[in-house]
Amino acid sequence: MALLLGLTGATAVASPSVIPPLPPLLGPRPAPQPQPPPPPPAATPEDRWALIIGVTDYAGRVKSTVGGANDARLVRDVLLRNGWREDRIRMLIDGQATGQAIAEGMRWLQANSSPTTFSLFQFSGHVKQRGGREFLWPYDSAFLADTDVVRALQGIRGTAWSSFSGCEAAGFDDGLSSPRHRVTASSQVDEKSYEDPQTGYSVWTGMLFDEGFRQQRGDANRDGVTSLDEAFDYAAPRAENFTSDQQPFGPQTPYRAGGDGPLRLDSPRI
């Protein structure tokens, strides 16, 4: 039967329902779910340091490159777009990139490194190979041997990325790569590296830093940020395919080693 409410303003109060007691829990209580680990700490803009070297015009009768200097400017632009401070970036272009200046620049990276810093070393230019060894070819032909380069870069504390763009570039990873030091190179130790006159960059640096990073074509998971591995995975097969018909030396196959996790330029882990 429906309950009729009069117009007297009185309110009908229903009897409370009786809720039976809950049965006791059977078995052990479920274990708490583990919380995801916090993200690794990242180097602040104050703790990011870069030495960028690019040589197009060499002293004397050494043949010029197409993209050495442009590569250096490209890398700098990508870093600035990712929040790096201009006063933490040292540029050595053409006549500035003497053998002495490069050696001093590597000592500068060492001196400014600490357990909380991230450091980038980038070289784009000629590489000389002799007697099974590789040499960075500075503007003034004051060659820097691979053993000296590796020794200097191994002295960097914190985490680091060393990027070499030149012929036989992977030869500079002579014990340099480690879980805290990523190494990338434009070609294997027995391969040449090439340049693209249409873009004005070396093939590898243009595809990695311009297409992969700056244009974000390497952003495979579409999260708006391109990691080094994403950019490398985008650029490496394209560089090899782009140079596949080069004769007599054949294509270049980019090289990657070291590192213990994703590397993002906007928040490099330390």
Language model feature labels by segment:
Residues 3-120, 126-129, 134, 265-270:
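Boundary/activation segment at the start of structured domains
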Residues 45, 84-86, 155-157, 178-179:
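Short, well-ordered coil/turn elements that cap or connect secondary structure elements
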Residues 47, 103-124, 128-174:
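Caspase-like (clan CD) cysteine peptidase catalytic core
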Residues 54, 79, 93, 160-250:
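Active-site-proximal C-terminal subdomain of hydrolase catalytic domains
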Residues 65-67, 105, 134-137, 175-180, ...:
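Short, glycine/charged-enriched secondary-structure capping and boundary segments
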Residues 68-75, 98-105, 145, 149-152, ...:
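Stable alpha-helical elements in mature extracytoplasmic
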Residues 80, 241-270:
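Terminal, contiguous helix-loop blocks that mediate binding/assembly
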Residues 132, 180, 204, 259-261:
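Residues that flank catalytic or metal-binding motifs in active/ligand-binding sites
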